[in-house]
Regions:
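Glycine-biased, small-residue-rich flexible motifs in mid-sequence functional cores and linkers
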Residues: 2-20, 98-380
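Short, small/acidic-rich helices and loops at N termini and domain boundaries
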Residues: 2-102, 367, 372-380
Length: 380
């Protein structure tokens, strides 16, 4: 297992019971089930995936699954149980976020093929809605490294979250520069969270999580290897999590251009850092700019285009303003002295599930802190 022993608190789904979540996880493990077929199952079974799990082959075919996928469902049923996989994720402190959860990344939710299930290690925060993807070649030049470090450092200091794919080259430089500048960064994997790829970036992945500055995200279950076909799908998530995509350095056939293509399809901004016309490493990004991508000479070119000058003020306001009555009730009960969740349930009169999910949201927003032992305090 490559998952690290970070000091992270495990949160179940904020929108469903653990039993229900287990069946979402189970179907997400079935080879052949993607966002479209997953939605077909939800529609056919009216969100009751436990019923789908117990259905026979004929009924699953009526729900829209192919014969091969149905065979994969039947095979998985004989080798594992939904509850067993959920227990494994809990032991590893991996959080599962579904499309039904309030904490599902809002920008990613907007895309047509949003993954129904996300596996995360580390913590997403309210500030991560202000994110920019930074992508490029795995074989970067000195120029590519220098300009990426410069732009990302300035973005991170402006509290822009940096999203990339944890690959070698530009991805590694982007993640590292964000961390060095004290900023946040999200690494999107094309494999399960128990398999850090490439292996040489295990230290970087560990640093992202253990520093509290980053989070690892994937749509792939534990054990899934980084097969070639997974990377384009991974790239759509990189773009989907972001307000825009910056291509730092890329040759004509770079995978970074696939990410830029997803961004355009998703209605997001695309930026490029101009490179030498004599360098093959910049031919892809130069063509991208020629075709209409915004050229970036300095960080203000990005901040102005995305209106990101006021991030600190916006995050501060979001962190202290309750969004609903449940948050208002709990905010009145929580002080700078630790308060146990049982006391909050008793004093608020709210249901246990409501208190649990609301506390999760309040912590993600930076309103409160979990201090261990199911106790909470105000964050400020």
């Amino acid at each position: 297992m490559e998952v690290f022993d970070a000091q992270s608190h495990y949160y179940p789904s904020d929108a469903m019971s653990l039993d229900e979540l287990a069946y979402w996880i189970a179907f997400n493990r079935v080879s052949g089930i993607g966002p479209v077929s997953f939605k077909s199952l939800l529609d056919y079974y009216h969100n009751d995936l436990e019923a789908a799990w117990r259905a026979d082959s004929k009924e699953l075919a009526q729900a829209g699954l192919t014969q091969k996928t149905i065979e994969n469902v039947m095979k998985l049923r004989t080798t594992s149980t939904p509850q067993r996989e959920l227990e494994k994720l809990e032991r590893l402190r991996i959080r599962v976020i579904t499309l039904k959860d309030m904490t599902y990344p809002p920008l990613l939710r907007e895309i047509d093929d949003a993954p129904p299930v996300l596996y995360t290690y580390g913590k997403l925060t309210e500030a991560d809605q202000f994110a920019l993807a930074v992508v490029g070649t795995r074989n970067s030049t000195t120029y590519g490294r220098q300009v990426t470090e410069r732009i990302v450092t300035d973005l991170a200091k402006g509290q822009v979250t940096i999203v990339s794919g944890l690959a070698l080259g530009i991805d590694t430089i982007a993640h590292t520069a964000a961390l060095d500048a004290g900023g946040r960064t999200i690494g999107v994997l094309a494999c399960g969270l128990d398999i850090i790829y490439p292996p040489t970036n295990r230290g970087l992945a560990r640093r992202m999580v253990e520093s509290g500055q980053g989070v690892l995200i994937t749509e792939y279950p534990l054990g899934v290897q980084p097969d070639g076909g997974n990377f384009p799908a991974r790239n759509r998530i990189i773009a989907g999590l972001s307000l825009g995509v910056l291509v730092a350095e890329a040759p004509a056939k770079s995978g970074a251009l696939i990410t830029a293509g997803f961004a355009l399809k998703q209605g997001r901004e695309v930026f490029g850092i101009p490179g030498s016309i004599l360098s093959n490493k910049s031919s892809g990004v130069n063509k991208l700019i020629q075709d209409g991508a915004r050229p970036v000479m300095e960080v203000t070119d990005i901040l102005e285009a995305l209106n990101l000058f006021m991030i600190p003020q916006h995050v501060e306001m979001q962190a202290v303003l309750p969004d609903n009555d449940d948050e208002r009730v709990l905010l009145k009960l929580i002080s700078h002295e630790p308060c146990h969740i049982d006391e909050l349930i008793r004093e608020s009169g709210l249901a246990t599930t409501i208190v649990s999910s609301t506390l999760t949201m309040m912590e993600l927003k930076g309103m409160i802190k979990h201090v261990g032992g199911m106790q909470y305090v105000l964050a400020r």
